[in-house]
């Protein structure tokens, strides 16, 4: 009994224990779920708050980006509208010019048509006159027959004798009348031919209108402040001396505010010096070694520009393939001035005029343009080679195997020889048209440049001279000798030789200063 009661108590205790354990687990689970749910809600609330802040921030950024985009779009639209307006104005101007030219051409065409009608009427008149003459001849023959019979009766002449007398008188009278008529018709024909030739020239000139570039012997370089002038001059003038010696250009630094003037009769030299000085001013470092580097860079840049100008000229004229070296020589004409005309512009003008004249008379237009473009090619190298620009041009064209019509045009455009082709004659006419415009040329400037070129030629022909530059408007010639050929003791003799040669060959007023420079450099490279 006791054992059974004890087992019952134990069973009941275990049941209560497990029941209490289950109840505690359930209560603990609900408590855990309650507190965990509260934490999750707090975290969710915090996350929602952060999400709202992010959304607000994104909205602000989106609004700001929209504002910036609208501003940028408005700016671009304004620029595009302005550009469109400018282009529209340009197109309107071009259309207006084209309309005016078309009106002029139409007027000229009508005039030519009228002249053709006039010529046709003249031909009809001539034909009618010819018929009248034939009728008159027949009448004269009838009269002669009558006279012949009368003469035979009166003078008792034989028929052959009378025939000879009558024929001689008739021949003399008819010949006189015919010669008078032929002379009148020849004068009319010459007059009509002259008018038609002038009309062709006017039409050719109207179809091409080129820009005219005036001559300029100085270039101006702007500098940021007056202190830069002192840096350009350098200590004891070493920088400006180095610039003048290396470039061969005269630097003029006066009281003009924030400007430096470059003076030289050689435009290529002056352009290289200008770019060199602009590079040095922008860089800020000005000393002899830096000047040499800047000069090298500027020389390459100008060489590339010369090539571009030559390529542009051949492209504009559409003359086909040209030798690369000949293109470079052609580009140099951009910097060559002759009688106040830019020679490259002049050559382009001659090319187009010659081409138009050729097309009007049925000749090869492309070949005429090519001959016109190269007719003054010798002027690109006339300061480097001996001979006239015509002789040099013929030599260059022959070297690069140009066609015989082109060589003939170069050789005959100054009437040094008779033109052997129609193309050469057309180029000579076009050259005269381009050169003969009022104010197109100035003799005095050309003579001045020729005198400076002659000074340099005399100096360069002296033994041991490396290069020379005429500066100070031809009042000084600066000569640089080769140090390995001319010793210090002989530079005075070189200066005296050049001076005597100048006195023999050049007529001038005043004094020309001859300065001979000899410089020796020693360079070693230190390796670290």
UniProtKB/Swiss-Prot annotation:
Topology in membrane: Single-pass membrane protein
Keyword Glycoprotein among record annotations: no
Top EC class of this enzyme: hydrolase
Domain KH, residue spans: 217-277
Cell compartment(s), UniProt: Cell membrane
Record field: transmembrane: 15-35
Limits of the HD domain: 343-436
GO cellular component: plasma membrane
Keyword presence, Nuclease: yes
Highest taxon of the lineage: Bacteria
Chief location: membrane
UniProt-listed Enzyme Commission number(s): 3.1.-.-
UniProt keyword list: Cell membrane, Endonuclease, Hydrolase, Membrane, Nuclease, RNA-binding, Transmembrane, Transmembrane helix
BP terms from Gene Ontology: mRNA catabolic process
InterPro entries reported for this sequence: HD/PDEase_dom, HD_domain, HDIG_dom, KH_dom, KH_dom_type_1, KH_dom_type_1_sf, Ribonuclease_Y, RNase_Y_N
Single Gene Ontology MF annotation: RNA binding
SUPFAM superfamilies: Eukaryotic type KH-domain (KH-domain type I), HD-domain/PDEase-like
Purpose: Endoribonuclease that initiates mRNA decay.
Family: Belongs to the RNase Y family.
Entries under NCBIfam families matching the protein: HDIG (TIGR00277), RNase_Y (TIGR03319)
HAMAP family hit by this protein: RNase_Y
Name of the featured protein: Ribonuclease Y
Originating species: Aster yellows witches'-broom phytoplasma (strain AYWB)
Designated gene of the protein: rny
